[in-house]
Amino acid sequence: GMRIVNREADMIKEYNEARTESLKAFGSEQIFIEKYLKAPKHVEVQILGDQYGNIVHLFDRDCSVQRRHQKVVEYAPAFTIRKEVREKMFADAVRLAKHVGYKNAGTLEFLVDADQNYYFIEMNPRVQVEHTVTEMITGVDIVRSQILVAEGYPLSSSEINIKSQKDVLCNGFAIQARVTTEDPTNNFLPDTGKIAVYRSGSGNGIRLDGGTAYTGAEITPYYDSLLVKIISYDRNFKVAAKKAIRALQETRVRG
């Protein structure tokens, strides 16, 4: 139901056709008109807030590599964005979270265009699949921290140990690659069946997060196609990329 209008002369025609299409499909002529961003960057800012109004950001991550409009490779920090733009996004993310009185871990998502103007999309009030890369570069256990926050611990407590934004440091680079049970020859549609052979990659600077990845596992159509997450870390981005590639090459899934 989305239409891209590149010329002003086409605006009225496309507008009317979209309204007609909406009426037939949903019984309403209501449509939304938004600025079109061509091949934008998808950048997220991770935040963490306690029950006492304290909120910090845990820097950002780039989630632009996608298939079927869903993420498949993420890395942190989002170093291809200019420093001053990133700092503005950090400030806006914290400001928005404070405005709504947000508590716990959350993610604010932005689109960044070719001129590095950024646009807020939405906020996800939960831990996301790609939180791992943020954990690797900050050393903050986001899952543990959100549980402690829910129990009533302030960020400044010895259990969480984030007294101010200055306590959150960004060190090195992390990359996450999602290994999924999908068929790349069929537009990445989810596949099902029994895993006959499973072998994971490993090595220094490699983290694996998985649940159903093992020999004999039955992959059903009732759950997400994500099998395992391979996360690499290094002080140097190119080295982190080499580690990720090696771990992916070592991974074997047959079925």
Predicted features, each with a name:
Residues I4-G255:
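ATP-dependent carboxylate activation and anion-phosphoryl transfer catalytic cores
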